[in-house]
């Protein structure tokens, strides 16, 4: 470890000829060095305390979460569980819907497909979905824009209905509402189109088998609910049910820079692509939400903003929590299902619950010991 003590601050010891002067100089120099070391010790210990999450702070956050119908809370740091709490019928073994938190697993699958040479993020979608080639807008859409939801295609929440027999076919026929890259529209359509693109890249092989083989099985997640339609197409926007501990494994993958327990699932350089925002929404990467606008941007309730018509939502400078580190990334699901990942603190925070009025910013301030 390199200690940040400026050597110029420590006066050079000069041995004087007389015994009295020598003793005086030794006392002076020793006192000064000890004082400097004491200051340095205070700096080091205070920095460590700031970065170390405390169980007492997590307990206060858990009390708040429980009051808002929270069913689970898990806090990990440096690979260790430092706090775990269940309430309102939740349990360590009880799986719970993570809703749109499902998207982030498909985001990792997309990066795996890049690694495997199946696609490139900035490839035009129309190279694969050739029906789009004649459309002046759709022909410009890239795979990256599907994943960060800036392709300008209608969000189409109706795709989640079980009555739709072929979601993929329905999704690729949806209209654009603006120039690609110019707006952020949240909805299931974008990943549904990606699912069709991946299916064609796999030459008809099962896309769910690809996600299982390259992502979920490697995380030890077991059987997942893909909400398949009559044609066997999965619904990538939602569907997974996980325990808090299972969901935290995705956080471990992120903290491991794509490596999970010694196995490189995606290259670190590719994983970084998931955490780059777009011009249309700097707070959303490739299926992950970002806190990079903190501490200067206003805090936003992402779920409430997503309920607004896309024309009314303001994404240009919003953050999740001003007091949380800017490198925090989040897998977010309806009803305030949350997987907060903070690389600078080597921390993972899972919160699951039923839909209730809940503040991410207040919750995070409690966990981080920064008031509330």
Predicted regions and their residues:
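Active-site Gly/Thr loop motif
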Residues: 221-224, 277-348
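Active-site SXXK
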Residues: 79, 96-122, 146, 194-198, ...
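Bacterial N-terminal signal peptides
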Residues: 34-45
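Active-site helix/loop module of the DD-peptidase/beta-lactamase fold
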Residues: 115-153, 173, 202-238, 242
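Bacterial peptidoglycan biogenesis and beta-lactam-recognition machinery
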Residues: 112-119, 199-208, 216-224, 243-266, ...
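Active-site-proximal alpha-helical segments within enzyme catalytic domains
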Residues: 193-197, 239-259, 337-351
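Boundary at the C-terminal end of the N-terminal hydrophobic targeting segment
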Residues: 49-51, 55
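A short, well-structured edge-of-sheet supersecondary motif
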Residues: 60-90, 339-342, 346-350
């Amino acid at each position: 470890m390199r200690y940040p003590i400026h050597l110029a601050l420590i006066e050079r010891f000069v041995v004087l000829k007389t015994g009295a002067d020598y003793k005086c100089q030794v006392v002076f120099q020793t006192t000064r060095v000890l004082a400097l070391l004491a200051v340095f010790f205070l700096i080091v210990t205070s920095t460590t305390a700031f970065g170390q999450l405390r169980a007492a702070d997590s307990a206060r956050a858990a009390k708040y979460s429980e009051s808002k119908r929270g069913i689970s809370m898990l806090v990990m740091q440096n690979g260790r569980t430092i706090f775990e709490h269940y309430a309102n019928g939740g349990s360590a073994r009880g799986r719970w819907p993570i809703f749109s938190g499902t998207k982030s697993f498909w985001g990792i699958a997309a990066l795996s497909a890049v690694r495997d040479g199946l696609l490139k993020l900035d490839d035009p979608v129309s190279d694969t979905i050739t029906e789009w080639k004649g459309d002046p807008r759709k022909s410009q859409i890239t795979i990256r824009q599907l994943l960060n939801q800036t392709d300008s295609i209608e969000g189409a929440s109706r795709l989640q209905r079980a009555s739709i027999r072929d979601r993929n076919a329905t999704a690729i026929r949806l209209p654009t509402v603006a120039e690609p890259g110019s707006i952020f529209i949240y909805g299931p359509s974008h990943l549904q189109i990606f699912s069709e693109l991946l299916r064609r890249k796999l030459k008809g092989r099962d896309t769910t088998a690809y996600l299982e083989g390259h992502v979920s099985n490697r995380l030890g997640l077991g059987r997942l609910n893909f909400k398949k339609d009559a044609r066997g197409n999965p619904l990538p926007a939602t569907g997974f049910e996980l325990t808090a501990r299972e969901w935290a494994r995705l956080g471990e993958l992120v903290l491991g820079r794509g490596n999970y327990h010694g196995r490189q699932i995606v290259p670190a350089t590719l994983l970084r692509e998931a955490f780059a925002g777009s011009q249309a929404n700097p707070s959303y990467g490739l299926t992950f939400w970002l806190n990079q606008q903190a501490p200067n941007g206003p805090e936003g309730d992402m779920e409430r903003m997503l309920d607004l018509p896309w024309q009314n939502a303001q994404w240009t400078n919003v953050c999740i929590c001003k007091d949380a580190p800017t490198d925090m990334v989040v897998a977010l699901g309806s009803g305030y299902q949350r997987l907060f990942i903070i690389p600078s603190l080597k921390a993972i925070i899972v919160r699951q619950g039923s839909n209730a009025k809940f503040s991410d910013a207040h919750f995070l301030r409690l966990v981080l010991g920064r008031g509330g």
